[in-house]
Curated annotation (Swiss-Prot):
Protein name as it appears in the record: Large ribosomal subunit protein uL1
Keywords: Repressor, Ribonucleoprotein, Ribosomal protein, RNA-binding, rRNA-binding, Translation regulation, tRNA-binding
Origin species: Vibrio atlanticus (strain LGP32) (Vibrio splendidus (strain Mel32))
Domain of life (superkingdom): Bacteria
CDD domains named in the record: Ribosomal_L1
Gene: rplA
InterPro entries on file: Ribosom_uL1_bac-type, Ribosomal_uL1, Ribosomal_uL1-like, Ribosomal_uL1/biogenesis, Ribosomal_uL1_3-a/b-sand, Ribosomal_uL1_CS
Length: 234
């Protein structure tokens, strides 16, 4: 049997696997256990009441978290003309068309999000095998293929998170850093859950948000009592 590290022993002793923690208690516990030498991310896993095998029940979208993610997001934009100037003014890091496509083909991809105007998809479409596996392919469902590229850039820079369920019907994404204030993490989580509820497929029956767990990069998952959250849409 593998020997538990000191960190793993502390987590085992502190976290009750079967317990649902109120959000303030859950966040306090994560912060206490976030002892890595770097600032850990706070991640969330949401088990959805969907049949992921059915395409009409899959959930995909994006939402801007009120307190961002704590990451400095680099945005590349495929567009031209006035849209290119608007993208630069909005804070885009790289803007181009064929020239940007050539960079991508060479493996020069120093960016986290790719945005494209509809007229640029003739260029971006050729990059699917490169951008797709990296989760960078622009998609209208998450607002990254849009005529309003400036807004998409601002959203990405402001801390927009994209989400889609995996084959087990679970959403995995980030809601910030362990260095965030407790209320910031709570409000980010609540904003994400509100967005997910709005994205509930009409064909999904029964309880939609079945389980919500939060964890840090190096820590254990803590299940959150949803009754301690405000997930009513305004």
């Amino acid at each position: 049997m593998a020997k538990l590290t000191k960190r793993m022993r502390v987590i085992r002793d502190k976290v009750e696997v079967t317990k649902e923690y109120e959000i303030n208690e859950a966040v306090a516990l994560l912060k206490e256990l976030a002892t890595a030498k770097f600032v850990e991310s706070v991640d969330v896993a949401v088990n959805l009441g969907i049949d992921a095998r059915k395409s009409d029940q899959n959930v995909r979208g994006a939402t801007v978290l009120p307190h961002g993610t704590g990451r400095d997001i680099r945005v590349a934009v495929f567009t031209q003309g006035a849209n290119a100037e608007a993208a630069k003014a909005a804070g885009a890091d790289i803007v181009g068309m064929e020239d940007l496509a050539e960079q991508v083909k060479k493996g020069e991809m120093n960016f986290d999000v790719v945005v494209a105007s509809p007229d640029a998809m003739r260029v971006v479409g050729q990059l699917g095998t490169i951008l797709g596996p990296r989760g960078l392919m622009p998609n209208p469902k998450v607002g990254t293929v849009t005529p309003n590229v400036a807004e998409a850039v601002k959203n990405a820079k402001a801390g927009q998170v994209r989400y889609r369920n995996d084959k087990n019907g679970i959403i995995h994404t980030t809601i910030g850093k362990a260095s965030f204030e407790a209320n910031q993490l709570q409000e980010n989580l609540e904003a994400l859950l509100v967005a997910l509820k709005k994205a509930k497929p009409s064909s999904a029956k029964g309880t939609f948000l079945k389980k919500v767990s939060i964890s840090t990069t190096m820590g254990a998952g803590v299940t959150v009592d949803q009754a301690s959250l405000d997930t009513q849409a305004n």
